[in-house]
Curated annotation (Swiss-Prot):
Origin species: Roseobacter denitrificans (strain ATCC 33942 / OCh 114) (Erythrobacter sp. (strain OCh 114))
Protein name: Phosphonates import ATP-binding protein PhnC 1
Taxonomic lineage of the native organism: Bacteria, Pseudomonadati, Pseudomonadota, Alphaproteobacteria, Rhodobacterales
Topology versus the membrane: Peripheral membrane protein
Keywords: ATP-binding, Cell inner membrane, Cell membrane, Membrane, Nucleotide-binding, Phosphonate transport, Translocase, Transport
Protein role: Part of the ABC transporter complex PhnCDE involved in phosphonates import. Responsible for energy coupling to the transport system.
Catalytic activity, EC: 7.3.2.2
Gene name, Swiss-Prot/TrEMBL: phnC1
Length: 263
């Protein structure tokens, strides 16, 4: 599904954000990226869809080498990669429905998108997705009227309406409270299972990674230092990943009754 070969990103300052990362993710696998600040987690995600250009190495989505594509070919392939952002990246003045449908901009012509005249099949799918995440009744609300958790659900719908093969998820819970964070992580993982999607989730909360994903990648100074199941994240292993940074501080505290409510 997704394959990274010797992926390197070196900035003009000489700082190396990624150091020859080799990674393969099969279809349907949800993977979490963990590591201290500056480890290269967000850079890795953005190198996959070339929002950040890799310095060297190759990225394959299926049989397509993304790193060798022209701009127009890359735009087509980006339709296969849904992106979910930390700060939601919604258009505040647009409605929930309009924000979701913006995920179809890569499929409809300029004038149809400019006039917001999307095919009925796209509108129907948007309603189905909003219903799945519990927001169908808010389709006509403006985005700036929503809570953080509701905004992230809209962002999830916008990514899924692209009908992607891969989800790239960058710190989806960083702006949310512990209870809502668990709800959002559970929702993302459930939707990936339902749709057979592969996903890379950059997550700051180690406990969320341990709770919800099948596989964890630990990055430190741009290099992979752990690749395995969440059960393998022992205190010693986490100290190896985070170094002097207190990894326990990344774990959001939540009361037992809040965990139960998030189920």
């Amino acid at each position: 599904m997704l394959r990274l070969e010797k992926l390197v990103k070196t900035y003009k300052t000489g700082d190396q954000a990624l150091k020859e990362v080799d990674l393969e993710i099969p279809q349907g696998q949800v993977l979490a990226l963990i590591g201290p600040s500056g480890a290269g987690k967000s850079t890795l995600i953005r190198c996959v869809n070339r929002l950040v250009e890799p310095s060297s190495g190759k990225v394959y989505l299926g049989n397509v080498e993304l790193t060798g594509l022209s701009s127009s070919a890359l735009r087509r392939e980006r339709r296969r990669m849904g992106m979910i952002f930390q700060e939601y990246a919604l258009v505040e003045r647009l409605t929930v429905m309009e924000n979701v449908l913006s995920g179809r901009l890569g499929y409809v012509g300029f004038w149809r998108s400019f006039m917001r005249r999307f095919p009925q099949a796209d509108v129907d799918e948007a309603f189905r997705l909003l219903d799945r995440v519990g927001l169908a009744h808010m389709a006509d609300k403006r985005a700036d009227e929503l809570s953080g958790g509701q905004r992230q659900r809209v962002g999830i719908c916008r990514a899924l309406i692209q009908d992607p093969a891969l989800l790239l998820v960058d710190e989806p819970t960083a702006s949310l409270d512990p209870k809502t964070s668990r709800q959002i992580m559970r929702l993302i993982c459930e939707l990936c299972r339902e749709r057979g999607l592969a996903a890379i989730i950059n997550i700051h909360d180690v406990a969320l990674a341990q709770m919800f994903v099948q596989r964890v990648i630990g990055l430190r100074f741009g290099a992979m230092v752990y690749d395995g199941p969440p059960e393998g994240l022992t205190p010693d292993r986490l100290t190896e990943i985070y170094g002097e940074e207190d990894w326990e501080a990344t774990i959001e505290q939540v009361d037992d009754d809040e965990i139960e409510a998030a189920e």
